[in-house]
Every structure is written in C-alpha cells, then in structure tokens.
C-alpha cells in the first residue's frame, strides 16, 4: 500500500551465523573487497539479520583500526595478511585506537603463522577466532582460549560432526604434521547442521 511504513523484524540468521557474532544491532567490518565468497556471504548474512555492514574500498591497516574505533565495530573478518599488516604498524599507532568494541574477529582463507596469531590474541584477546571450511560445506572453529592450549589447531567441527584427515590411500592420519585430504561428516542431528 502507498504511503505506509511497514515495520518488519530482520530475517532470522542462517546456518551458523551465531557462531560468528552475527546479530541484529552488530556492526560488521569486512576490511577489504567483497568479491571473495566468504566476505560476501558474511556481509550478506549480517545485513540480512539487521547488522550494520561497514565496507572498506581497500585494506589499509591504520584505517581499519580507525573504523573499528569510530564505528564501534563488534564483528569482523580477516585473513592472516591483514593481521601481519596490522602488527607491522608502530606500537604507538596500534595503541592509539580503541578496539575494545570487537567481540568477534574471525579469520580464515590461509594458514596463520603461530607467532602472528599469538600476537593478535595478546592484542585483541578473546575476539580472535579461526574457522576452516570448504566451499562444499562443513567446517571447524577454534576460539582464542582453546587455541592457546592447542597452537596450530583449527579446532573442532563447528556443529558437532566429525573431521577426518586421510592420506592418499584413504587411510586415516593420526599423527600430527602430516598432509592429507580433509573430510567433514555432518552431525547426526539435522537440527545441528
């Protein structure tokens, strides 16, 4: 109807949105272009549930910190290269900005060097989370405190399923630091998927 304002609640979150701090009223920063699938999907999901999405035209480490402080960013998504560039800023610059509004700073897309992740946890604390996932579905999640006791891990299946690492013959790999193919098994309860 004309000249009527319809008030609607945001659509409910999809999938594991709650795992990554997605909620109505959140302020989400994807600190680079939206063409990678994960950043676009996270941005769309955040917008869909009523969050504010603040998009940077290109990544600039100090500008990202300025935006976090100015916009009171609560959730964000990073790659290890972003972390390296943030950490390469002079300490005085890093301390200039208040990033205490961050509740979730999730990272993925490439292995994060242990020293880099350790430094980010020391700086941003429990906000740091990492996920590992495949385009086909399934994934793992690890939060800062668990990672500190399992450095180098990408966590456990995010919805209670199982993760298998298999060698080229399809046999399970039990020892650490061996390459293999990663397989996800969905949890038995469809509500957990």
Question: Model regions: which residues?
Answer:
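Solvent-exposed alpha-helices and their adjacent loops that cap or buttress functional pockets
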Residues: 19-23, 97-98, 155-157, 174-176
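AMP-binding/adenylate-forming core of the ANL superfamily
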Residues: 175-191
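Adenylate-forming
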Residues: 2-18, 28, 65-67, 83-90, ...
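Conserved AMP-binding/adenylation subdomain of ANL enzymes
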Residues: 2-75, 89
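Thr-Gly-centered strand-to-loop micro-motif
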Residues: 30-31, 55-56, 106-108, 166-168, ...
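Short beta->alpha linker loops
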Residues: 59-60, 81, 111
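Residues that mark the start of a beta-strand
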Residues: 26-27, 103, 181
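Gly/Ser/Thr-rich phosphate-binding loop
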Residues: 48-51, 73-78, 87-151, 158, ...
């Amino acid at each position: 109807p004309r000249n009527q304002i319809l008030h609607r609640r945001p659509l409910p979150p999809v999938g594991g949105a709650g795992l990554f701090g997605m909620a109505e009223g959140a302020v989400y920063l994807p600190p680079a272009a939206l063409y990678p699938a994960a950043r676009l999907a996270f941005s769309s999901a955040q917008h869909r549930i009523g969050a504010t999405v603040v998009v940077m035209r290109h990544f600039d480490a100090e500008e990202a910190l300025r935006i976090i402080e100015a916009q009171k960013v609560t959730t964000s998504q990073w790659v290890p290269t972003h972390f390296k560039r943030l950490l390469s800023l002079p300490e005085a610059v890093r301390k200039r900005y208040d990033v205490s509004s961050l509740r979730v700073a999730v990272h993925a897309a490439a292995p994060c060097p242990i020293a880099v992740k350790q430094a980010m946890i020391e700086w941003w604390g429990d906000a740091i989370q990492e996920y590992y996932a495949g385009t086909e579905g399934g994934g793992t999640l690890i939060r800062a405190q668990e990672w500190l006791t399992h450095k180098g891990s990408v966590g456990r299946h995010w919805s209670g399923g199982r993760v298998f690492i298999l060698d080229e013959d399809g046999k399970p790999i039990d020892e650490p630091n061996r390459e293999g193919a990663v397989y996800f098994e969905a949890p038995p309860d469809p509500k957990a998927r």
